Curated annotation (Swiss-Prot):
<dbReference type="InterPro" id="IPR053952">
    <property type="entry name" value="K_trans_C"/>
</dbReference>
<dbReference type="Pfam" id="PF02705">
    <property type="entry name" value="K_trans"/>
</dbReference>
<keyword id="KW-0769">Symport</keyword>
<keyword id="KW-0406">Ion transport</keyword>
<keyword id="KW-0812">Transmembrane</keyword>
<feature type="transmembrane region" description="Helical">
    <location>
        <begin position="219"/>
        <end position="239"/>
    </location>
</feature>
<dbReference type="GO" id="GO:0015293">
    <property type="term" value="F:symporter activity"/>
</dbReference>
<feature type="transmembrane region" description="Helical">
    <location>
        <begin position="287"/>
        <end position="307"/>
    </location>
</feature>
<keyword id="KW-0633">Potassium transport</keyword>
<keyword id="KW-1003">Cell membrane</keyword>
<dbReference type="GO" id="GO:0015079">
    <property type="term" value="F:potassium ion transmembrane transporter activity"/>
</dbReference>
<keyword id="KW-0630">Potassium</keyword>
<feature type="transmembrane region" description="Helical">
    <location>
        <begin position="374"/>
        <end position="394"/>
    </location>
</feature>
<dbReference type="Pfam" id="PF22776">
    <property type="entry name" value="K_trans_C"/>
</dbReference>
<feature type="transmembrane region" description="Helical">
    <location>
        <begin position="345"/>
        <end position="365"/>
    </location>
</feature>
<feature type="transmembrane region" description="Helical">
    <location>
        <begin position="59"/>
        <end position="79"/>
    </location>
</feature>
<dbReference type="GO" id="GO:0005886">
    <property type="term" value="C:plasma membrane"/>
</dbReference>
């Protein structure tokens, strides 16, 4: 396939350094799955006896799920479908939409599917910290039941501290993530080898025949077990989502060189332990270690789960930023916590909402076993959407025929469907929680997209063509005042409403006038040579278009200051006034938006509380003049 692109350029870092960094960020979530995956796979509620053949089959199912879903689907297929080196469901959605538009197909169904997959990720972002931290701290119950009442308060304390720390950024402690994660995977491998030595026949689980026999022998019961097996590959989406940070080669090297072998050894070791001692099913992960290592492992597991949670939280920030810049979410205040790494961001509004949702999940479900029922729905749903979007990229973007596109993705779609179906069996037991979170975010995104369309249509109904307006204006030109006026407008060919209001009320025009349009492209970044386009309109008026990718920081002040001399414009920001329109949305029953009245009110609320455009575009507040307009939709 021809979708592979070279790794992102990291001239200051070697492949070894990138691989070490990827271990801490990419593999934190999937690396902590041994804490609960085996325990939940053999949960007595499934009604499958703990006999040797069943244990071999269950462990084999876990190993081959990792092989098929992670090694084959993500590492070999999905990571090729990158958007100029950038991964993640928003980047893939943008790529799929552009691929479909090129051949004249309607993008609406793909947009709906992609946004739903992105919405489900937020359910995962809520459950991952809750599940991971709870399962780590539950290890202290293995040592003594006297500490059991403190597990929940300790988990709440760790999570609150984690979210409160977000505003400081991860630059200071991020360097520790890789080394700590290496120690974690080595500890997984060592314990696994120790367990295998107690029952070497567990190596028979490496054969897929045991997994197939397990599924065929137990029928519907084994189908329900798949809902627990999928816990072994939660976090696989991170391999794709973090491609832009590390490149595909370091991520693949870390997976095949350390992560997959360590996970396989640990799962085999836990299986051997259960065969030797069936009572170990209470907590096979911690019971795999000698008693003297229990509390050090609880501490190490807590550190590993905090790292996993941090990676998920950072992923939610990144997804939200991309969603804002692609126009799927309202503007929020995005704080850059590092001067050197543009990807290290903090979104206060999202952080607060995530913290509340995570605490609700922890206190509401109370244990990792209860959370396990809720965990799988969001993960498998997002994975299915990723595979579907990849099909559209292969077929429409890479121009492979339908048969080859189905051959490449059909098997993985079937596997994803099986896991989605098995996780839906647990909707009543807790699977409803991420579905409610995802549905809520989905409605918010759809409402914002439709509301912005309705607003633009409403504004266009009163638009005046810019060219003809300027021609008539300068037949009897208004007085000119010193300085530069920049009018931000989403439509470069029409007169900005802020200019009309300025002329009506002040009856003057600056000596230099710029009509500025900022366009967000469906690519990760826009080369500096293509960022700005300047068009003289006469009478010292100019039309400027700035282009940014969804991974760029839309810094208008910097972009204007960096205009090449050939453009004929030099900007002194302190001698420039920026005129912005701010629409006050009024929800009107039976308005032109076509939305239900409650959605119109929701859009009006989101619009009213959206982040300030001046802050978002990094325009100095003391150079901004904001003009309000009331609009009914």
């Amino acid at each position: 396939m021809n979708g592979e692109t070279p790794d992102a350029s990291h001239p200051q870092q070697s492949r070894a350094e990138l691989t070490l960094a990827a271990l801490g960020v990419v593999y934190g979530d999937i690396g902590t799955s041994p804490l609960y995956a085996v325990k939940e796979t053999f949960n007595p509620a499934h009604g499958i006896p703990l006999v040797t053949e069943n244990i071999l089959g269950g462990i084999s199912a876990i190993l081959w799920a990792l092989m098929v879903v992670v090694s084959l689907k993500y590492v070999i297929l999905i990571m090729r479908a990158n958007n100029r080196g950038e991964g993640g469901i928003m980047a893939l959605l943008a790529l799929a939409l552009s691929s479909v538009k090129k051949v004249g197909r309607s993008p609406t169904p793909i947009l709906l599917v992609g946004l739903f997959g992105a919405a489900l990720f937020y359910g995962d972002a809520v459950l991952t910290p809750a599940m991971s931290v709870l399962s780590a701290l539950e290890g202290i119950e293995v040592g003594t039941t006297a500490l059991q009442p403190y597990v929940l308060p300790a988990s709440v304390g760790v999570l609150i501290a984690l979210f409160l720390f977000q505003r400081h950024g991860t630059a200071a402690i991020g360097a520790l993530f890789g080394p700590v994660t290496i120690v974690w995977f080595l500890a997984l491998a060592a314990a696994g080898i120790h367990g295998i030595a107690r029952y070497p026949a567990i190596l028979g689980a490496l054969s897929p025949l045991h997994a197939l026999g397990f599924v065929t022998q137990h029928g519907f019961a084994s189908f329900a077990v798949l809902g627990a097996v999928l816990l072994a590959f939660t976090g696989a989406e991170a391999l794709y989502a973090d491609m832009g940070h590390f490149g595909s080669a370091p991520i693949r090297l870390a997976w095949f060189g350390l992560v997959f072998p360590a996970l396989a050894l640990n799962y085999l070791g836990q299986g051997a332990l259960i065969i030797v001692n069936a009572k170990a099913i209470e907590n096979p992960f911690y019971l795999l270690y000698p008693s003297w290592a229990l509390y050090p492992m609880v501490a190490l597991a807590t550190a590993a789960t905090v790292i996993a949670s941090q990676a998920t939280i950072s992923g939610a920030y990144s997804l939200t930023k991309q969603g804002i810049q692609l126009g799927y979410l309202p503007r929020m205040n995005v704080v850059h916590t590092s001067e050197r790494a543009i990807g290290q961001i903090y979104i206060p509004t999202l952080n607060g909402m995530l913290l509340v949702a995570v605490l609700v999940a922890v206190l509401g479900f109370g244990s990792s076993s209860n959370l396990a029922s809720a965990y799988g729905v969001a993960v498998t749903g997002t994975m299915l959407v990723t595979t579907l979007l990849t099909f559209f990229v292969i077929h429409y973007g890479w121009r492979y025929n339908l048969l080859l596109s189905l051959v490449a993705t059909g098997f993985f779609i079937a596997v994803d469907m099986a896991f989605v179906s098995s996780s839906l069996l647990k909707v009543a037991e807790g699977g409803w929680f991420p579905l409610v979170v995802g549905a809520g975010i989905f409605v918010v995104m759809l409402t914002w997209v439709r509301g912005r369309q309705a607003l633009l249509e409403r504004l266009q109904s009163t638009d005046v063509p810019l060219k003809s307006f300027l021609d008539s204006l300068f037949l009897a030109p208004p007085p000119r005042v010193p300085g530069t006026a920049v009018f931000l407008t989403p439509t470069p060919d029409v007169v900005p409403h802020a200019l009309m209001h300025n002329l009506n009320h002040n009856r003057v025009l600056h000596e230099r006038v710029v009509f500025l349009t900022v366009k967000m492209k469906d690519v990760p970044s826009v080369p500096a040579t293509e960022c700005a386009a300047v068009e003289p309109l006469g009478h010292a008026c100019y039309r400027i278009t700035l282009r940014f990718g969804f991974m760029n920081r839309p810094d208008v002040a910097q972009a204007l200051g960096a205009l090449p001399p050939a453009a004929g414009l030099e900007f002194d920001i302190m001698d420039t006034s920026f005129f912005l329109s701010r629409e006050a949305i009024v929800a009107a029953a039976g308005g032109p938006s076509g939305m239900a009245s409650w959605r119109e009110r929701l859009f009006a609320t989101m619009s009213r509380n959206a982040g300030n455009a001046a802050d978002y575009f990094n325009i100095p507040a003391n150079r901004v003049i904001e003009i309000g307009t009331q609009i009914k939709i």
